[in-house]
Amino acid sequence: MIRTVPVGLGERAYDVVIGPGLLDQAGERVAAVLGKRKRVAVVTDAHVGAHHGERLSAALQGAGITVDLITIAPGEESKSFEGLADLSDRLLALNLERGDQIVALGGGVVGDLAGFAAAIYKRGIDFVQVPTTLLAQVDSSVGGKTAIDTPRGKNLIGAFHQPRLVLADLDVLATLPARELACGYAEIIKYGLLGDFAFFEWLETNVQAVLDRDVDALVRAVGRSVEMKAEIVAEDEKEAGRRALLNLGHTFGHAIEAEMGFGEALKHGEAVGVGMAQAFRFSARLGLCPSQDAVRAQAAIKAAGLPTTLADVRPEPFSADALIAHCGQDKKAQGGKLTFVLARGIGDAFVAKDVDRAALKAFLVEEGAV
């Protein structure tokens, strides 16, 4: 069962193809969006490359495409200035030309880093996303956001650079650890929470089917998530308005990640899980959202085994002032004012500008920060 979701961006439109067996079809599908030279650099990490690198390379070579494989170290640490410089140097050493392409095979780190390298290499070359985590399939591979992290925060240096094609092969999820699968589910339920109550209700009763990797459930869950993101990106590519809704849970989540040092102790999807639960509780505390919706949202996130409170992340209390400072670094902030995606209810998120710092601090203290 293959589903294709178009991302409507005029001359830069592309398809997100979702379903099993897509790695084996990658040759013909990538060849269709490649230039005449038929050469690609596949960027992957050591873990993903060991599982899927040879299979993807064989499919590409079978379509007459020359393949150079670049392997980076796994983990968020690669998504840095040093990692970008190293990847750029390796691409230059290959003498990749503008008519060639980069193929990003991996999760969000690989996609973000390879996509940013594609955006700036020789002032920009095309690239293809082949996301291998559930989180990347429903979020970072779609929409053209590419970036690296800095010590001051996550994704603060980057570019908008749309892929030519996204191949979301559901078969690759078979090797994905349960923790990574739950992280992807956080981004899936985000779409229901921000704008589709019926989808949220479906997820409440089908969470286990998704986590058990049931193909029909995955096609529906990934398909609807991508469909919603594609619709929003087509309307607001560069986050001037509605696209900011996709950051539900991310302002709180990124602040927590920054305090935790962006390491393995707290994965991005887990941070988003806490952040979404906090966004709903904060909305309820401000009187914007019914308290029962905040309770229901938290229960649905928790059902996937995701953390929903600061205490779930670590026993030591967080500093409220430090979290607020990180929130001020958020890309949605304007004029030094705090901006959050909050909710009037499940399926009804909105962008709240100039959020009161005192109210935020009182909420964080209530949440267990000091």
From Swiss-Prot:
Its main location: cytoplasm. SUPFAM superfamilies: Dehydroquinate synthase-like. It is an enzyme of class 4 (lyase). The keyword Zinc applies. NAD(+) binds at residues 108-112, 132-133, 145, 154. Transmembrane segments: none annotated. One of its GO terms (molecular function) is 3-dehydroquinate synthase activity. GO terms for cellular component: cytoplasm. Belongs to the sugar phosphate cyclases superfamily. Dehydroquinate synthase family. InterPro entries: Dehydroquinate_synthase, DHQ_synth_AroB, DHQ_synth_fam, DHQS/DOIS_N, DHQS_C. Gene3D superfamilies: 3.40.50.1970, Dehydroquinate synthase-like - alpha domain. This is 3-dehydroquinate synthase. The keyword Zinc applies. Its EC number is 4.2.3.4. It is found in: Cytoplasm. It comes from Caulobacter vibrioides (strain NA1000 / CB15N) (Caulobacter crescentus). Zn(2+) binds at residues 187, 250, 268. Pfam families: DHQ_synthase, DHQS_C. The gene is aroB. Binds 1 divalent metal cation per subunit. Can use either Co(2+) or Zn(2+).
